[in-house]
């Protein structure tokens, strides 16, 4: 097993969080936010996003290296999927000694080199490799290639979106979607 991913606060359709107790017990989070947008989101966020919760939070516990992936920006995600794009932030809760993650490229690469490295499995050779420890924080704007590697438990705060393009999965059975156009040149 690769690990676990718990969606702790979600308004993503089909994966909505539910109030556990109190007067709104059993109510789905989007319904609650719709009834009390200013009280839950604050005035500025409610004005910017209406009755929509703009964030999704997760706890990810990676036992093995997770797939290398990228997320589209708002414009591409809206055009291709009718959804928001996805920028995210990781807060490292726990990291085994020597644990690392990938975030971005070491240097600029051409679309041709990118495609060849994905196909021949050498894409990790050009990714920026970051050693991590508890307390580290990483911001991953939409379009930044990234992967959580084994031995890391983190909290993820991201835009409320489930659009992910998997680039490379270490030759495990997987699929390649259309990530190349998400990566800024």
Predicted regions span which residues?
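Active-site glycine-rich loop that binds ribose-phosphate moieties when present
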Residues: 109-139
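Flexible, active-site-adjacent loop/turn segments at secondary-structure boundaries
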Residues: 31, 58, 112, 121-125, ...
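Short, well-ordered, mixed-charge alpha-helical segments that flank or form enzyme active sites
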Residues: 76-77, 98-103, 109-114, 141, ...
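A short hydrophobic beta-strand segment most commonly corresponding to one strand
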Residues: 88-90, 147-171
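Transition-metal
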Residues: 1-109, 169-185
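Conserved metal-binding segment of the jelly-roll/cupin
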Residues: 68-71, 132-150, 159
